[in-house]
């Protein structure tokens, strides 16, 4: 299996989801001055912020993806959000999928449920298997 990369704000909702998921993952730093580079294909797990499509993707994630090295390795995106955002629920996944030309694989609310954890575990495994067969 390849990597998961995620960002979690100070609310730690996405971080708690990733801990429960129990798969190897790299966290995009909260501090905007810290940078990371990912050297293998990865699925990005990202929260969505309110304010519509324009403000949905966290700045740290934008900075991470603006690095061509990182952008070249993204293979899919999973988004979290809050259903209170209505149509914009989880829309960071849609924005990133469109801009990076990758599939939007799943969306979950806040910290996710056990069903979300199970679905993501299974889906991530199947996604990497399918991708490796088509390579």
UniProtKB/Swiss-Prot annotation:
Entry coiled-coil feature ranges: none
A molecular-function term among this protein's GO annotations: FMN binding
Biological process, per Gene Ontology: protein modification process
InterPro entries in alphabetical order: Flavoprotein-like_sf, RNR_Ib_NrdI_bac, RNR_NrdI
Xref: Gene3D superfamilies: 3.40.50.360
Family statement: Belongs to the NrdI family.
Free-text function comment from the UniProt entry: Probably involved in ribonucleotide reductase function.
NCBIfam families: nrdI
Protein's name according to its UniProt entry: Protein NrdI
Organism of derivation: Salmonella gallinarum (strain 287/91 / NCTC 13346)
Originating gene: nrdI
């Amino acid at each position: 299996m390849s990597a998961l990369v995620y960002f979690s704000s100070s609310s730690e909702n996405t971080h708690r989801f990733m801990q429960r998921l129990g798969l190897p993952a790299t966290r995009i730093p909260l501090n905007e001055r810290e940078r990371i580079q990912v050297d293998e294909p990865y699925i990005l797990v990202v929260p969505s912020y309110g304010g519509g499509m324009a403000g949905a993707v966290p700045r740290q994630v934008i900075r991470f993806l603006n690095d061509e090295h990182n952008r070249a390795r993204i293979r899919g995106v999973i988004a979290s959000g809050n259903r209170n955002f209505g149509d914009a629920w989880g829309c960071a996944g849609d924005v990133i999928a469109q801009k990076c030309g990758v599939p939007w694989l799943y969306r979950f609310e806040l910290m996710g449920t056990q069903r979300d954890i199970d679905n993501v575990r299974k889906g991530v495994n199947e996604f990497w298997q399918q991708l490796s067969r088509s390579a």
